[in-house]
Amino acid sequence: MNIFYTKTYNMGGTNAVKQEIVEVSARKLGYDEISLFKFDDQSDSDEELKIRMEAITSPVTAGSTVIFQYPSMVGGRYDRFLTDALKKHQDLKLIFFVEDFGFEIYKEKYPDIENEIELLNRADLLILQSVQMKEYLKEHGLKEIPVIYQVMWDYPYEKVDN
């Protein structure tokens, strides 16, 4: 069984820092990276984006586990195509590590909570920041999905040079 984590490149801010924190831990545990790149996904047709996702997810095999650092900050459409490609793998376990709500920080690409809930409902496990976050998501339609809480972000780590 292989374990993967996603990391989005070409973005800044606190979401980039959060992704780096997860990256450091994931590398120490021997997990493999699925590299995502922030770009205007609207420049791809649906077929082009589907092909892109097949290439991005090509290292993933049946029985793998993928930790998706959500949101990717590319956009809801991109995230939906990514999860579609991942879910094609037999016995795949998809974990959403919810670092923020896209609709609160990137409204142009994540227009509303309903689309985000649809994505989150694809998960086999959620990593959330708090019980309050889970309750908020449930109020907006989140199904019963197992949850782990990651409540602390501000801890020291060594930056990984690629």
Model-predicted segments: where are they?
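Residues at the starts of beta-strands that form the adenosine-phosphate
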Residues: 1-2, 32, 93, 124-125, ...
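Structural beta-sheet core signal
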Residues: 4-5, 96
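A short, glycine/small-residue-rich beta-strand->loop->alpha-helix junction that serves as a flexible
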Residues: 5-21, 73-75
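A short beta-strand-loop structural module common to alpha/beta enzyme folds
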Residues: 6, 29-46
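Extended catalytic core of nucleotide-activated donor transferases of GT-like folds
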Residues: 45-136
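Donor nucleotide-sugar binding/catalytic pocket of nucleotide-sugar-dependent glycosyltransferases
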Residues: 124-138, 142-161
